[in-house]
């Protein structure tokens, strides 16, 4: 076990020796891209002294980068208006609900589960089995209206492919 670890250590030393002076094993192609970019724009931005090890990724360098020459007067002329948050009535915008974390707690899922339980308790597995049930549900074009409001309409696959294609 120990000899295999020594072999791996020797192998890793051998692999690091294969890199040239321009490359380090921890450098990525992004590092060279950023170095070239900052060298080209060094007359505009004072970036100070940096090496490839100090710029390991884009996020670390953003915090240390000095801003462009922007005076305080130009900054005070900016007109930033806050957008007013509109209150969204509960139950009207179903697509804005967070159902990824708790789908069973969603009002849509809960009401649909109750609808399914009521249908199976009364002997009907599918809404619209009988003519009585079809006449009890208000129809428009053969589909129940409340399903259209929820966006649960059946669409032929050919229409979807024609729409997307």
Curated annotation (Swiss-Prot):
Disulfides per UniProt: none
GO biological process, one term: multidimensional cell growth
Database matches in InterPro entries: VUP
Reported function: Involved in the regulation of plant growth.
Name listed for the protein in its UniProt record: Vascular-related unknown protein 4
Native source species: Arabidopsis thaliana (Mouse-ear cress)
Remarks, miscellaneous: Plants overexpressing VUP4 exhibit severe dwarfism.
């Amino acid at each position: 076990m120990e000899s295999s670890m020594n072999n791996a250590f020797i192998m890793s030393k051998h692999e690091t020796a294969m890199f040239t002076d321009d490359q380090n094993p921890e450098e990525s192609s992004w590092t060279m891209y950023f170095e070239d970019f900052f060298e080209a724009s060094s007359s505009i931005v004072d970036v100070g002294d940096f090496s490839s090890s100090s710029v390991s990724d884009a996020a670390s360098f953003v915090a240390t980068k000095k801003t462009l020459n922007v005076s305080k007067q130009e900054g005070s002329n900016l007109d930033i208006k806050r957008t007013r948050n509109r209150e969204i009535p509960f139950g009207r915008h179903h697509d804005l609900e967070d159902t990824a974390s708790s789908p069973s707690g969603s009002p849509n899922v809960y009401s649909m589960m109750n609808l399914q339980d009521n249908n199976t308790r009364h002997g009907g597995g599918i809404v619209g089995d009988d003519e009585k049930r079809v006449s009890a549900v208000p129809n428009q074009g053969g589909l129940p209206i409340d399903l259209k409001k929820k966006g649960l309409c059946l669409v032929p696959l050919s229409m979807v492919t024609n729409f997307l294609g």
